[in-house]
Amino acid sequence: MTATEGIRPDVARTVRYPVYERFYTWQGEGVHLGAAAYFIRLYGCPQACPWCDSAGTWHHDSRPEGVTLMTAGALAAVVAQDSPDGAFVVITGGEPILFDLAPLVDALHALGRRVHIETSGIAELRGAIDWVTLSPKPFGTWPTPEVVARADEVKIIVHDVADLQAGLDTLEGLRPDAVIWLHPEWSKARERDMAVLNAITDAVKTNPRLRAGYQMHKLYRADELDAHSDKRLIPLGGNTDLGY
């Protein structure tokens, strides 16, 4: 099938998404850890996480000079060109559900690709997305009940011990089969902050539904191997000098 088969041609050609970066790598966290994946990172996010590792998608001191606008059809075409059949697609950000993803999801499905999303869940989730990874930001806008109910897995970023319970508090209505990951924020993992690491260990031992997680792609620096990735431009874990 072609990249635009299955969706209206006018939609495939006219809806445009602000693409910060796109690259082929593997999923570095969660249930699909280690699996080949093509990432589409969209520009724009209102959450302003203080430890953001993709601050180029929103922070005024790190955003690019220009952002490429691409149609659903054009994005599907580069996915088909730059990754083999069988690799799923991850739409991330920034905050991707600020945009109507239905045309893009349809175009990717027309290629036979499964579509995953990584989101903080603050808006309506549009499109027949196959896998929803929810990463709530309790200090910002909480996820909507509708997105919580659709989540297949949850990733709570633990920058300090209080973040752990605060993240869990946002999950009322979560499906019983949804997986809940506790990830140390990257600087805490890198510096072996034992208060954070031990809090995650204690939480998992207390509640077997929880799982301890890690961002393995950062150890491998796998994203940087694709020429289209901008990871080399933004320090891993953000830039504390700029306040993120």
Model-predicted segments: where are they?
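Conserved Radical SAM active-site core
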Residues: 3-6, 12-13, 17-24, 36, ...
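A short beta-strand-turn-helix
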Residues: 28-30
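Short, solvent-exposed beta-strand edge segments and adjacent coil->beta transition regions
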Residues: 35-37, 151
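Conserved AdoMet/S-adenosylmethionine-binding subsite of the radical SAM
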Residues: 85-86, 97-244
